[in-house]
Amino acid sequence: MELTKAWAKENNVELTFVDDQLTMDNIHLVEGHDGLSTSQNSKVPNEAYPILKEFGIKQIAQRSAGFDYYDLEEAKKHGIIISNVPSYSPESIAEFAITSTLNLVRKTRQIEEKTKEHDFRWQPAIRAGLVNEMTVGVIGTGHIGRVTAKLFHGFGVKIVAYDIYQNEEAKSFLEYKDSIEEVVAMSDIVTLHAPATKDNFHQFNNEMFKKFKPSAYLVNADRGSVVDTKGLIKALDDGLLAGAALDTYENESLFIPKDFSDKEIDDELFLEVLNHEKILFTPHIAHYTDVSVRNIMQIALKSVLEVLETGDTQNRVN
């Protein structure tokens, strides 16, 4: 909040802060403003666009790299530019993906649970593998995927990857394969870094998990929709893979980022995720560092000003 206020003062802009995301219940609060920026993690209803147009809004600046919460054509039809923050701190997410991997492989949660019970024995259940001896599969080699691969490269691992658009620079530290299935079959760790699209919805389903090594781990600091949660839980229960670290959940918008410490969670699937012994869940927090928060805010609000002053922005996605 202080960073945002400082930006507003520096740029002579008046800001109104709303705690919630944009919904049909609070859309009336936009009236009287020249620009709009939101950190959406639920779909913007199509009926919102004509209302925003009526309010004189010409853009929505999404404060994240992902923009799958918007109907881009519908927004464009009403003269509304959608922008994103294509790269704000890939290092933040990459470091978290590495951290999640280490927590899985080194069985941190199991060790913590034993320690809290004052059971300090060295047992086979907490004996770990060695990342250095593993093959890492990176799905998606955009900004975040490449940084993640570089960090893994520092462990001395073999890195295989899949992306529709291969990056020449990345070929110096990873090897591209012709399909996701080929990457999965070779990998001890599979880390996801592809944008959410209609084509990759539930791409990682039970059938895909059948191609995993039984000893392999899945790390998703990407988008929840890429993973079929029911399929993942079944695969874990059936021993198709050893564990998963999820920083996102396909129906998370009902819960994240909100405080449910004194509320009941009425999503049985989410409860299964939270309680599953082979899943490490974190609340979409991989990006949440001082650097990324500052960059997200500054880049998104700069996009608002660009549209207001020039009619367009370099971060436009529609």
Residue ranges of model-derived segments:
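An N-terminal-biased, well-structured beta-alpha scaffold segment characteristic
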Residues: M1-I82, N205
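Short, conserved active-site loop motifs that form the nucleotide-linked donor/cofactor pocket
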Residues: V13, I80, L174-E175, K278-L280
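Short glycine-/small-residue-rich Rossmann-like dinucleotide-binding loops
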Residues: Q40-N41, D188, A194-A196, D222-R223, ...
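A short helix->loop->beta-strand "cap" motif at the edges of active sites that frequently abuts
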Residues: E54-Q59, H78-I80, V157, P214-A216, ...
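Phosphate-binding beta-alpha-beta segment of Rossmann-like dinucleotide-binding domains, i.e.
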Residues: H78-T135, V147-K150
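Rossmann-like dinucleotide/phosphate-binding beta-alpha-beta segment
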Residues: A125-P214
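Rossmann-like dinucleotide-binding domain for NAD(H)/NADP(H)
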Residues: S215, A221-N318
